[in-house]
C-alpha cells in the first residue's frame, strides 16, 4: 500500500494528485458531513471546510495507522451563507440565478493525519465572480453541464464547462478545484512522501 491515502472519492482530487505524480490509495471516509455542519453551524464556512477535512483524515487514519492520510473538503459561501451541494439537478437553475452577477467564496481545507491525529492543516479561500450571463446561456449550461450540477457545491466544475460562468477569479486554480496542490506538495516533501 502507498504511504499516502486520500480520504476522498472526489474525481478531481484523484486526477490532480495522479497528474502531479503522487502515489496514493483511495479510501473515502464515512464521515457524516451534514451532522458535523449542523453541530458546528456557529463556525464560518472556511473553518467548516478545515473541520470536515480533519474529521475525514483522522477517521480514515485510525483504520490505517501506519499511513499518512489526506483529508480534503471545500465549502462555498454566497452572501455570507454556507451552501451545500444540490441533491438534484432541477434545483441548479435557482442556485445559478442566485449567483448571477455576484462574487462568492470557495474555501478549501486540507489536513494530513496519522494515527487519528492531525499533523498539518491548510486553509485557502478563493473569490469567484460570476458574470451576468443571459437566460439563453443558462438554458444551454443546464442542458450541457450534466453531473457538474450536483457534483460540486456551486453547480459547476471550474475545470470544465463551468469556467464559462465567470468574469474573473482571485485564487489559485488548484484551490478553486478543491486541492491546493503546491502547498500540499511542499508538505508531502516534508513528510517524505515525495522526493524533495
Predicted feature descriptions by range:
Residues 1-68, 81, 136, 143, ...:
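N-terminal polybasic phosphate/anion-binding patch
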Residues 17, 53, 73, 92, ...:
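Residue-level signal for inorganic ion chemistry
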Residues 22-34, 109-117, 151-163:
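Mobile beta-alpha loop/short-helix "lid" or hinge segments that flank ligand
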Residues 68-74:
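Glycine-rich phosphate-binding loop
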Residues 74-104, 130:
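Active-site-adjacent loop/tail segments of enzyme domains
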Residues 77, 111-114, 131, 168:
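Short beta-strand-to-turn element immediately C-terminal to the catalytic PLP-Schiff-base lysine
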Residues 97, 109-113, 117-121, 125-126:
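Anionic-ligand binding region
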Residues 121-195:
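Active-site oxyanion/phosphate-handling segment shared across diverse enzymes
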